């Protein structure tokens, strides 16, 4: 019985998992920069377009809360921004 419960919990944790992080521009691994004086105005809509729950400006970049696993975040492909 315990094994069935553990397997069920592992399956549910995969289905309902989400994560927080800095979303990146496609193909560049560069964060979306923002103005910290406008904490929510730019980042919340940007994050919601990526199916996150919300987002805000943190350390001059958009931080999203509740991103789906398939959305790339800063650090997934290394830590360097490859612009241009």
UniProtKB/Swiss-Prot annotation:
<keyword id="KW-0027">Amidation</keyword>
<dbReference type="InterPro" id="IPR002061">
    <property type="entry name" value="Scorpion_toxinL/defensin"/>
</dbReference>
<feature type="disulfide bond">
    <location>
        <begin position="47"/>
        <end position="64"/>
    </location>
</feature>
<dbReference type="GO" id="GO:0005576">
    <property type="term" value="C:extracellular region"/>
</dbReference>
<feature type="disulfide bond">
    <location>
        <begin position="30"/>
        <end position="81"/>
    </location>
</feature>
<dbReference type="GO" id="GO:0090729">
    <property type="term" value="F:toxin activity"/>
</dbReference>
<dbReference type="GO" id="GO:0019871">
    <property type="term" value="F:sodium channel inhibitor activity"/>
</dbReference>
<comment type="similarity">
    <text>Belongs to the long (4 C-C) scorpion toxin superfamily. Sodium channel inhibitor family. Beta subfamily.</text>
</comment>
<dbReference type="InterPro" id="IPR018218">
    <property type="entry name" value="Scorpion_toxinL"/>
</dbReference>
<dbReference type="InterPro" id="IPR044062">
    <property type="entry name" value="LCN-type_CS_alpha_beta_dom"/>
</dbReference>
<feature type="disulfide bond">
    <location>
        <begin position="34"/>
        <end position="57"/>
    </location>
</feature>
<dbReference type="InterPro" id="IPR003614">
    <property type="entry name" value="Scorpion_toxin-like"/>
</dbReference>
<keyword id="KW-0800">Toxin</keyword>
<feature type="modified residue" description="Serine amide">
    <location>
        <position position="83"/>
    </location>
</feature>
<dbReference type="Pfam" id="PF00537">
    <property type="entry name" value="Toxin_3"/>
</dbReference>
<keyword id="KW-0732">Signal</keyword>
<keyword id="KW-1015">Disulfide bond</keyword>
<keyword id="KW-0964">Secreted</keyword>
<dbReference type="GO" id="GO:0006952">
    <property type="term" value="P:defense response"/>
</dbReference>
<dbReference type="InterPro" id="IPR036574">
    <property type="entry name" value="Scorpion_toxin-like_sf"/>
</dbReference>
<keyword id="KW-0528">Neurotoxin</keyword>
<protein>
    <recommendedName>
        <fullName>Toxin Acra3</fullName>
    </recommendedName>
</protein>
<keyword id="KW-0872">Ion channel impairing toxin</keyword>
<feature type="signal peptide">
    <location>
        <begin position="1"/>
        <end position="17"/>
    </location>
</feature>
<feature type="domain" description="LCN-type CS-alpha/beta">
    <location>
        <begin position="19"/>
        <end position="82"/>
    </location>
</feature>
<feature type="disulfide bond">
    <location>
        <begin position="43"/>
        <end position="62"/>
    </location>
</feature>
<comment type="function">
    <text>Toxin with unknown target. In vivo, induces severe neurotoxic events in mice such as excitability and convulsions, leading to the death of the animals within a few minutes after injection. Exerts very strong cytotoxic effect on a mouse brain tumor cell line (BC3H1) (IC(50)=5 mg/ml). It exerts its effects by inducing a stronger necrosis than apoptosis in BC3H1 cells.</text>
</comment>
């Amino acid at each position: 019985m315990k094994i069935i419960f553990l397997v069920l919990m592992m399956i549910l944790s995969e289905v309902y998992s989400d994560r927080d992080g800095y979303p990146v521009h496609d193909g560049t691994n560069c964060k979306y920069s923002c103005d910290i004086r406008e904490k929510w105005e730019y980042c919340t809509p940007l994050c919601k377009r990526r199916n996150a729950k919300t987002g805000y400006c943190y350390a001059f970049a958009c931080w999203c809360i509740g991103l789906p696993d398939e959305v790339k975040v800063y650090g997934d492909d290394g830590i360097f921004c490859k612009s241009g």
